[in-house]
């Protein structure tokens, strides 16, 4: 007789093949039709709020692996918090102003842009930004990210711009905004000032030259520079007051350098010398050297920032081309020379170099220095150099009139530092990082010489040329913006923009013209706490900001400065950061290396759940690695998780909630499995709370593959398949499988949003329209029997000893399948022996063998001695266990008594 039809074989529509690429878009459509975002929020009305505020990605292209990772991490947080019972809204946003967009539009428009008005350029920029908002929105939705996609916040929205200007007015009112002629980062390609956060460092080849300035007849002070083009602006040479300096004789000349750099300098320049004098740097103060090619003198000044790392300890100083140089210039009342125009071309003030591009001038200046006999050494060096974040070209320091935020006025910096201490930083080193940055940061350059941005409503007096900010002008403009947007600044006349009664603070006249600088985009996004959260009555400060760790100098910093200036408190309670994404070998991704991973390719090939699983697998607090092999590993892990879900669903096809067996009636093994589930829920919950998703991933992966598939589910397979459908033996195991499946689906739901939904819809416990309306599994202490947990901890260790012995017997051809075996075991100590005796009735099931005898074993394991031999009797044709009682039943001659009783309906 074929007994296959008498077995309780698994059956489910949850297929082994995931087919995520086809199924996921169908689920997204279904969620959209049910309005899942609002449906889920409504279900949590009146509950405690959890607000994660979205840092806006830039709307200037397709999403990349970094933005995809960031959005998935945020989605995991929101979904988990929602399941924990929080009212957790998620309003996505986009950064839509600024240079990157204007640059792209300029490239697309080509020569046409020269004939376009500012308003026309702004309109093109707006269209470009809104197009990519739509593109990115669909791409994020395809990743399974849930949010208020129909109502995102956009920094170009007039309602948003109004709040930018109101916060700007607060800064003006508090005296934190000033105009100054200071050296700032300047991009000659994009022709605009840049803030520190808009500068990236890349390797760059620069000239490295040693030049001598004549101090007195036949005596020279030697400087070193990697920017020869700044020499026309040199007005001083800085030395350290406390360093020792030496006068050395080289040929018939005397040169001055720092003693601490003498050996390095001599080796690089290949000179022979003798030391003739030694003195402190402060002894050189106020002496004057002759500029090598400009008709002026260079003052010797003192500066503590001079180091003994490179060069000569005598630092070329041009206040118009360096932040430290500028401060030294103020101290010594030096002129701020910057003979370079917005395109990086020398002006007439550079003398013979006028009209030359600065990078081309390097070569000419070096040649001239050589002709003048003052060039000691010239070579090339590779070093890290600042580049524009948008065009990727090198930037310069250039003194120009700009608007700045003073970070020290009114104690702003100190207040920010105090607020940083109150924030919870994940990882903890984030606090040290942002603290160091805030302590060291210079005043903030906030003006940009571009049209696509929030205009700075500054006006210029036609009579005396004074450029200033007036609160009445700002107030009037705020009212106009709410109705007409910031284009109004470019469209309306001065009479419409400037209210009556405004007078020039310098000369008292009232004839003005507009200026056209726009605000740094970091001001835009830094004001989101007000525009998106506080002004709408949302919870403030918010619970969480979650971004890449580059935002310590970007959005985290701009937000806390704006918030403290406007509200006196930090805008966030907690900050979580993730690292940069690199390839499998830890290299930066680049098109030239061919190692760029496109999230769209992963989603199109494997499905979004695979990408989401990868995101959960990474220890994202550190730098993150991804590549084809790593993604393939996630595909394999996913298959194991899916197969576990499928097995559980398949074996619960005839099980309903009313069939649940009370805990006290469960079999001991099932009690252990249910208790272990509580431990897993507790550990997973703890990891979610700490944003340690890689630990969630590892724990659930091990739980499914080792503890369930290879252990518990393998052990109970006999009971599930062979025992009577409604028997206590089967229902006891099914009860625990029910709880495991229910909890597993819920714990996977924030990560595998699509797979969890698919499994939930086919589960016996479905009670909501979507799994994402479900609540997080709770730890039930009453399901933890401490004695059972302790006993089975040992039993599973004993099982490991037995499995090793079975494997050895298999190699020796004593057995084939483990059910061919009879095992004899004995504990190696009294405690082990006691546990064996106590649970002897279940040991054959746990070891998956036909018979277990307690007695002296031949092979010593760690906890028991084991003997494996061929089981006695015949093989039952239904359960495959060996028994000496096979054939004793008159009706079923080839099965064991247990199977005969099942077939007759006698086993309950």
Swiss-Prot record:
GO terms for molecular function: aminoacyl-tRNA deacylase activity; ATP binding; isoleucine-tRNA ligase activity; tRNA binding; zinc ion binding. The keyword Nucleotide-binding applies. GO terms for cellular component: cytosol. One of its GO terms (biological process) is isoleucyl-tRNA aminoacylation. The keyword Disulfide bond does not apply. Binds 1 zinc ion per subunit. It is found in: Cytoplasm. ATP binds at residue 591. Gene3D superfamilies: 1.10.730.20, HUPs, Ile-tRNA synthetase CP2 domain-like, Valyl/Leucyl/Isoleucyl-tRNA synthetase, editing domain. Its cofactor is Zn(2+). Zn(2+) binds at residues 876, 879, 896, 899. A motif ('HIGH' region) lies at residues 57-67. Catalyzes the attachment of isoleucine to tRNA(Ile). As IleRS can inadvertently accommodate and process structurally similar amino acids such as valine, to avoid such errors it has two additional distinct tRNA(Ile)-dependent editing activities. One activity is designated as 'pretransfer' editing and involves the hydrolysis of activated Val-AMP. The other activity is designated 'posttransfer' editing and involves deacylation of mischarged Val-tRNA(Ile). This is Isoleucine--tRNA ligase. It comes from Thermosipho melanesiensis (strain DSM 12029 / CIP 104789 / BI429).
């Amino acid at each position: 007789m074929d007994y296959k039809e008498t077995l309780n074989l698994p059956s489910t529509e949850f297929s082994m093949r995931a087919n995520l690429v086809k199924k996921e878009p169908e689920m997204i459509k279904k969620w959209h039709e049910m309005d899942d975002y609002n449906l889920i929020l409504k279900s949590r009305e009146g509950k405690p709020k959890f607000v994660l505020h979205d840092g806006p990605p830039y709307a200037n292209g397709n999403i990349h692996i970094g933005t995809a990772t960031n959005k998935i991490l945020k989605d995991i947080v929101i979904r988990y918090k929602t399941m924990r019972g929080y009212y957790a809204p998620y309003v996505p946003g986009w950064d839509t102003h600024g240079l990157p967009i204007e640059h792209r539009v300029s490239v697309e428009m080509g020569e046409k842009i020269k004939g376009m008005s500012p308003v026309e350029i702004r309109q093109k920029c707006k269209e470009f930004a809104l197009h990519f908002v739509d593109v990115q929105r669909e791409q994020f939705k395809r990743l399974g990210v849930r949010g208020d996609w129909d109502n995102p916040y956009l920094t170009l929205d007039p309602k948003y711009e109004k709040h930018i200007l109101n916060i700007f007015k607060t800064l003006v009112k508090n005296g934190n905004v000033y105009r100054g002629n200071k050296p700032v980062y300047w991009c000659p390609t994009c022709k605009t000032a840049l803030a520190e956060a808009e500068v990236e460092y890349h390797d760059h080849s620069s000239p490295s030259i040693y030049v001598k300035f004549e101090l007195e007849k036949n005596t020279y002070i030697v400087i070193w520079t990697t920017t020869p083009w700044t020499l026309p602006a040199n007005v001083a040479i800085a030395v350290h007051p406390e360093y020792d300096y030496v006068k050395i004789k080289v040929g018939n000349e005397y040169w001055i350098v720092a003693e601490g750099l003498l050996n390095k300098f001599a080796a690089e320049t290949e000179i022979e010398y003798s030391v003739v004098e030694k003195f402190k740097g402060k002894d050189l103060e106020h002496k004057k050297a002759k500029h090598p090619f400009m008709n002026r003198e260079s003052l010797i000044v003192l500066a503590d920032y001079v180091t003994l790392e490179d060069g000569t300890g005598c630092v070329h100083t041009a206040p118009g081309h360096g932040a430290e140089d500028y401060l030294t210039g103020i101290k010594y009342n030096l002129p701020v020379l910057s003979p370079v125009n917005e395109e990086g071309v020398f002006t007439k003030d550079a003398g013979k170099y006028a009209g030359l591009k600065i990078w081309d001038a390097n070569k000419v200046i070096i040649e001239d220095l050589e002709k003048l006999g003052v060039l000691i050494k010239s070579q090339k060096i590779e070093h890290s150099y600042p580049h524009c974040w948008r065009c990727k070209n090198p930037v310069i320091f250039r003194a120009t009139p700009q608007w700045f935020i003073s970070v020290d006025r009114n104690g702003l910096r100190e207040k920010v530092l105090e607020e940083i201490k109150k924030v919870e930083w994940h990882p903890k080193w984030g606090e040290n990082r942002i603290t160091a940055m805030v302590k060291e940061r210079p005043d903030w350059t906030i003006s940009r010489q571009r049209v696509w941005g929030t205009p700075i409503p500054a006006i210029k007096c036609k009579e005396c040329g004074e450029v200033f900010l007036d609160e009445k002008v700002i107030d009037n403009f705020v009212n106009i913006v709410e109705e007409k947007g910031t284009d109004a600044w470019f469209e309306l006349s001065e009479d419409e923009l400037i209210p009556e009664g405004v007078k020039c603070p310098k000369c008292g006249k009232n004839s003005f013209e507009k200026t056209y600088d726009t605000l740094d985009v970091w001001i835009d996004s830094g004001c989101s706490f007000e525009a998106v959260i506080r002004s709408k009555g949302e919870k403030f400060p918010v619970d969480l900001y979650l971004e890449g760790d580059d935002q310590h100098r970007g959005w985290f910093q701009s937000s806390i400065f704006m918030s403290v200036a406007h509200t006196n408190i930090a805008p966030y309670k907690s900050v979580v950061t993730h690292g940069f994404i690199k390839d499998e070998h830890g290299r930066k991704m680049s098109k030239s290396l061919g190692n760029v991973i496109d999230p769209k390719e992963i989603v199109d090939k494997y499905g979004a759940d695979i990408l989401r699983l990868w995101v959960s697998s990474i220890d994202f607090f550190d730098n993150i690695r991804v590549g084809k092999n790593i993604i393939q590993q996630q595909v394999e892990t996913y298959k194991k998780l899916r197969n576990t879900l499928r097995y559980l669903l398949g074996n619960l096809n005839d099980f309903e909630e009313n069939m649940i067996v009370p805990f006290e009636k469960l079999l001991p093994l099932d009690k252990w499995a249910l208790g272990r589930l509580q431990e897993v829920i507790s550990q997973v919950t703890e990891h979610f709370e700490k944003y340690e998703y890689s630990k969630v991933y590892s724990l659930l992966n091990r739980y499914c593959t080792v503890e369930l598939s290879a252990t518990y589910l393998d052990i109970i397979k006999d009971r599930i398949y062979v025992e009577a459908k409604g028997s206590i033996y089967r229902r006891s195991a099914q009860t625990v499988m029910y709880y495991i499946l229910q909890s597993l689906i819920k714990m996977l739901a924030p990560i595998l949003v699509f797979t969890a939904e698919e499994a939930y819809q086919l589960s016996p416990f479905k009670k909501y329209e979507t799994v994402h309306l479900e609540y997080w599994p709770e730890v039930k202490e009453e399901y933890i029997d401490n004695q059972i947990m302790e006993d089975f901890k040992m039993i599973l260790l004993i099982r490991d000893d037995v499995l090793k012995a079975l494997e050895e017997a298999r190699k020796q051809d004593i057995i084939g399948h483990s059910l061919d075996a009879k095992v004899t075991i004995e504990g190696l100590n009294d405690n082990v022996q006691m546990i064996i005796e106590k649970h002897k009735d279940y040991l054959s099931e746990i070891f998956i063998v036909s018979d277990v005898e307690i007695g002296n074993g031949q092979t010593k394991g760690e906890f028991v001695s084991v003997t494996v031999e061929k089981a006695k009797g015949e093989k039952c044709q239904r359960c495959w266990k060996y028994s000496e009682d096979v054939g004793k039943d008159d009706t079923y001659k080839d099965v064991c008594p247990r199977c005969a009783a099942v077939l007759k309906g006698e086993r309950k």
